[in-house]
């Protein structure tokens, strides 16, 4: 509401203060908040920190559920998506957020990204089920390499020598982590063959997850540019479109016999598991929003690198809350992976600070893949 009072209306004569001891100065006019909200929405550092916290929460909650004999992974993911949809719908009803209403044509165009998301989160849950949190986070670094070269192919990115060196450190840390994991499995008491087989299954799921994650991140970045989706639009369509697919996959591919349900939800831990599932579902609200937010205000490579910089607190959570082996090779792998993240950050800073000479573009270049994507959206 506009304040029409003149400046002299706010003046106070000092000799009249004693006559009106109860005088209260009028409140200052409200300050516009649009610029502040815009600066927060486009703050790259804040988006990275938000993604860090949400990814740590989601990883720990998922590991808690999957660390038992839980094998209803599709059901877990469906609960997460359902809780996410309920949460953002309540926020929209309260006027806290806004996003587009459901549109069938937009849903059809976004559905391939949803399938990539389902592939990413399912393979990630399977890898986390077989691997410890430190090993899982270290191997997640390999996704950064795939995404970086994907950006070279589709978004005109480049890889410097220092960036390439950081990639070498990431691969080296993954090798150390795998060797430490296998060494601990062989030397520990119990069936070593069974433990090594479990680790091998985890490595295979991790490889598939790296491919799915890089495809999802690159595809989502390109699709966001073409559809002009905002952060909550992306979160809404990602979770809403994934629910029917996850329900069908859970009903067809997972065992819903009474014995298996009792094994997944034992009476002693049933309440704790259900609470963790709901909490992990709420964490998907933050991970869905902050991941899209981070990709929008930074780049898909920076988004993937956040996971590498997160490895230290995530690994510590695995060592504190779960039975992850604490050995010199495993700690060394964590530290090498963390150093690789620092080297990568320095490489990106130097690359961004270097002036681009000799390049005078008159138009925005469009690759053949980008043009074909735009043509498909028009159809």
From Swiss-Prot:
One of its GO terms (biological process) is establishment or maintenance of cell polarity. InterPro entries: SCL35B1-4/HUT1, TPT_transporter. Pfam families: UAA (PF08449). Residues 17-38 are annotated as: Disordered. Coiled coil: none annotated. The chain crosses the membrane at residues 40-60, 70-90, 111-133, 137-156, 163-182, 199-219, 234-254, 273-293, 302-322, 326-346. It is found in: Golgi apparatus membrane; Cytoplasmic vesicle membrane; Endoplasmic reticulum membrane. Keywords: Cytoplasmic vesicle, Endoplasmic reticulum, Golgi apparatus, Membrane, Sugar transport, Transmembrane, Transmembrane helix, Transport. It is a multi-pass membrane protein. The keyword Transmembrane helix applies. Residues 61-69, 134-136, 183-198, 255-272, 323-325 are lumenal. Residues 1-39, 91-110, 157-162, 220-233, 294-301, 347-379 are cytoplasmic. One of its GO terms (molecular function) is GDP-mannose transmembrane transporter activity. One of its GO terms (cellular component) is Golgi membrane. The keyword Ubl conjugation does not apply. Involved in the import of GDP-mannose from the cytoplasm into the Golgi lumen. Homooligomer. Belongs to the TPT transporter family. SLC35D subfamily. This is GDP-mannose transporter 1. It comes from Emericella nidulans (strain FGSC A4 / ATCC 38163 / CBS 112.46 / NRRL 194 / M139).
